[in-house]
UniProtKB/Swiss-Prot annotation:
Record's protein name: UPF0391 membrane protein lpp2589
Cleaved signal peptide residues: none
One Gene Ontology term, aspect cellular component: plasma membrane
Species whose genome carries this gene: Legionella pneumophila (strain Paris)
Transmembrane parts of this sequence: 5-25, 30-50
Membrane-topology descriptor: Multi-pass membrane protein
């Protein structure tokens, strides 16, 4: 799960660079939406990964 969280975080950073940096003016609105979408997905997968990391089940 933490791998997916890291992937979504990287995608969010890339979307932010395009949306907030003015590189792609025509796609700025879409990039901003994608940034927040992937940022939310990053947080969700991060929480799922941290909660799912429990010790081995009792025998």
């Amino acid at each position: 799960m933490l791998t997916w969280a890291l992937i979504f975080f990287i995608i969010a950073i890339i979307a932010a660079a395009f949306g907030f940096g003015g590189i792609a003016v025509a796609a700025a609105g879409i990039a901003k939406i994608l940034f927040f979408l992937f940022l939310v997905m990053f947080v969700i997968f991060l929480i799922m990964g941290l909660v799912g990391r429990r010790g081995p089940p009792p025998v």
